Amino acid sequence: ADIILMQLEIPIDTVEYAATIACKYGKKVILNPAPASSLSNSFLMNVHTILPNRIEAEMLSGIKVMNIESAHRAAQAIGEKGIENVVITLGKDGAYVKEKDEYTMIPAKEVETIDTTGAGDVFCGAFSVCLSEGHSLAKSVKFANAAAAIAVTRIGAQSAIPYKREVVL
């Protein structure tokens, strides 16, 4: 695998060790920093792309994310910790992206939301799949937004995960 998607529901020492090994072998570490917790800068420097939601972005940056301006400041602050790519997920509003020194707001698809359970996980998985196929960060975020939009129109977590063929940009 060229990409490793990680989250924080296992001991942080394990996550940090896995990220260190992955970087040693030139793999891209994608981190979903959930559940929200404080993380060391030495660990974050091993992360290629971080995918925080509003709450996690606030914890990492100290900036409450309420709009595009505050998302920009939060992404910038998180990036200053050594992370090149920051994707702050904003639910129905889409995602705010910092890719190296470029910043972009990528809107979500408008859908009628039924159940948001698992939408963040769908976003992270779809993003990682698209990026692993060699697509750009922006295209990967658009694909992830589209997949998450499908997921929120269905009930449940696993049962709401769309097949790749269902996701249309």
What kind of region is each of these model predictions?
Residues 1-49, 55-104:
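Ribokinase/PfkB-type carbohydrate-kinase core domain
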